[in-house]
A protein has these predicted regions:
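Penicillin-recognizing serine hydrolase domain
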Residues: 19-32, 37-52, 123-124, 149-295
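Short, well-structured active-site flanking segments
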Residues: 91-104, 200-207
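Positively charged n-region of N-terminal signal peptides that target proteins for export
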Residues: 1-5
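Conserved catalytic neighborhood of penicillin-recognizing serine enzymes
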Residues: 109-140, 222-237
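Active-site helix/loop module of the DD-peptidase/beta-lactamase fold
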Residues: 102-117, 157-170
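C-terminal motif of bacterial Sec signal peptides marking the signal peptidase cleavage site
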Residues: 13-15
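Active-site SXXK
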Residues: 62-63, 76-100, 188
């Protein structure tokens, strides 16, 4: 057990080194590859049930798997994949640099800030908006600013995912619409594991409300889509997602009784996905959950 706990952070810190400004060349998957760990559900005897089709709960510090359910089944991740977009943007740095909005940035649906071509905004403000309110036009602008085009940025996403071991994933754009992309609960946990270690992203994901000032002077109040943040200070962020194809998706993180955990839920058909997250994370905070190996 101790060997696993010590080794996992080193592996992921090594993975971090592949994600910065220039991602190593890799061979991203265009279809799901064979999953290494067993795909059978793992239900510890005293774990609460989850409605999500796929889920995984990990220790946010060691990467130990504490609970899993169909963790290697490919599913549509919806906007939870914005965590990878945010990670690439954050690692590039210079978040005070200005981004000029292009016409193509404004043609995304359905959640938008209402950005207009020619307007200029700091990367930091656009990044905050995608993590708090899931703004797709801000996401498209950041992707184009990062790599020149959405297609080039998508290539960077897939290379980055492959480099950190998320090899059952394929991303078709920066924001998660439409349903051409896929991932797994385990792969999204690998991405979330690194995002959790990014101080800038951690601060942004903890915000329940932010105010976005448009060039016109108009101010838009952005309320977090992650409803856990208002339930308890124990919960400290991550990302929501929803499409008809994906169902409800949620990546949540928290610190309960000294244990930091990350929970990924994909493919839930219930509006009680936040309640499910609370129950399982509280269960882990009581010291429940034994290691099922590293991610």
């Amino acid at each position: 057990m101790k060997a696993v706990i010590l080794l996992v952070p080193l592996l992921f810190l090594a993975g971090c080194a592949t994600l910065p400004r220039e991602v190593r060349r890799a061979s991203p998957a265009t279809s799901p590859v064979a999953a290494a760990p067993s795909n059978a559900p793992v239900w510890p005897a005293n774990a609460p049930g989850l409605a999500a089709q796929s889920a995984i709960l990990i220790d946010a510090r060691s990467g130990e798997v504490l609970f899993q359910k169909n963790a290697d089944t490919p599913r549509v991740p919806a906007s939870t994949q914005k965590l990878l977009t945010a990670l690439l943007v954050s690692r590039r740095g210079n978040l005070d640099a200005m981004v000029t909005i292009a016409p193509e940035d404004t043609r995304v649906e359905p959640i938008r800030l209402g950005l207009r071509p020619g307007e200029r905004y700091a990367r930091r403000d656009l990044l905050q908006s995608i993590l708090v309110k899931s703004s797709n036009d801000a996401c498209a602008a950041l992707a184009r600013d990062h790599s020149g085009t959405e297609a080039a940025f998508t290539g960077q996403m897939n290379q980055a995912a492959w480099s950190l071991g998320a090899r059952n994933s394929y991303f078709a754009n920066s924001h998660g619409l439409p349903a051409a992309q896929f991932s797994t609960a385990r792969d999204m946990a690998r991405i979330a594991f690194l995002a959790y270690r990014d101080p800038t992203l951690r601060r942004m994901m903890q915000q329940t409300v932010v105010y976005f000032r448009h060039n016109s002077g108009r101010v838009t109040r952005l309320e977090a889509t992650n409803k856990l943040l208002k339930r308890s200070n124990a919960y400290n962020g991550m990302k929501t997602g929803f499409t008809n194809a994906a169902g409800r998706c949620l990546i949540s993180s928290g610190r309960l009784n000294g244990r930091e955990v990350i929970l990924v839920q994909l493919g839930s058909e219930t509006r009680y996905i936040f309640d499910d997250a609370e129950r399982l994370m509280a269960w882990s905070g009581r010291g429940s959950g034994t290691s099922h190996g590293a991610l």
